[in-house]
Amino acid sequence: MRHRKSGRHLSRTSSHRKAMFQNMAVSLFEHELIKTTLPKAKELRRVAEPLITLAKEDSVANRRLAFDRTRSKEIVGKLFNDLGKRYATRQGGYLRILKCGFRAGDNAPMAYVELVDRPVGGSVEPAE
């Protein structure tokens, strides 16, 4: 029985899941819009939203925690200098998940994950 067990396994080992969501979070913060499967998108929320909440209070300790979770100095800079300030007054719900049909190969449900209030300009291709 899996009573009170949170999270999805996604047919991966725990280390693979951790690395995958770390990479997906970095891609999301870099491009501000990514396309992935719906179950991965829903799990990505649990990784990405706490990082934005962490970035709302700029301190050395919080920057080190963010670097530990993303392993990217550029993304840590963007989190604290741009995204933390952008969402300073928002109490959560920084991501929007939009369903976008099914993948051709295996009919998996697909979704766009985007940052709410992101600047919209030109033709932006989502990161896959």
From Swiss-Prot:
InterPro entries tied to this protein: Ribosomal_bL17, Ribosomal_bL17_CS, Ribosomal_bL17_sf
Alphabetized UniProt keyword annotations: Ribonucleoprotein, Ribosomal protein
Any GO BP annotation: translation
Gene Ontology molecular function terms on file: structural constituent of ribosome
PROSITE patterns reported in the protein's UniProt record: RIBOSOMAL_L17 (PS01167)
Any single Pfam family the record assigns to this protein: Ribosomal_L17
Highest taxon above the source species: Bacteria
Disulfide bonds: none
Cellular component terms (Gene Ontology): cytosolic large ribosomal subunit
Similarity comment text for this entry: Belongs to the bacterial ribosomal protein bL17 family.
Quaternary state and interactors: Part of the 50S ribosomal subunit. Contacts protein L32.
Protein name according to UniProt: Large ribosomal subunit protein bL17
Species in which this protein is naturally found: Pseudomonas savastanoi pv. phaseolicola (strain 1448A / Race 6)
